[in-house]
Amino acid sequence: GLAGANRAASYGAKCAVIEQARLGGTCVNVGCVPKKVMWFAAATADTLQSAQNYGFDISINGFNWNELKHKRDAYIERLNGIYANNLNKNKVEHIQGSASFIDAHTIEMAGKRYTAERFLIATGGQPSIPNIPGAQFGISSDGFFELEQQPKKVAVIGAGFIAVELAGVFQALGTQVSLIVRGDHALRQFD
């Protein structure tokens, strides 16, 4: 959505972006980018743990989940700011909230109507929570990035790449992990 609005504005179109959450979408806020920060921390932890196998005499004095979360969140906020500045620079109006279609050329948000010849819909995705007993005690992959404390133990349910990546991050940073899969192995659609 942001790239489309910025590109259209660069060609002279009058554009607006309506966003109910933080700018940048799923990838920047609760997907690719924060996951890569966590994955890099996990890889660093793994390297430190195996350093003695390569002749290094180091001691590891612990890991601070809160510090990593704080730095990761600050990095994401910086990216949100960059996106806001780019919209402003390109004269794309940023409207906080969500809208509904009235007809093919009209949307409404908070009682105000906006008309346009064309709309680009880039809604992103949301995790689906199963309708099973106890589901309220779990978190989605989005919730992983909201954890204020590092859990001592987790059960990650899923066999796809997101579940396997998050299980790997937890494990490398010292959390005891159980990966629960429906089939006979993880990443079955990727092997």
List the model feature ranges, each with a label.
Residues 6-150, 183-187:
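Glycine-rich flavin
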Residues 148-190:
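Rossmann-like NAD(P)H-binding beta-loop-alpha module
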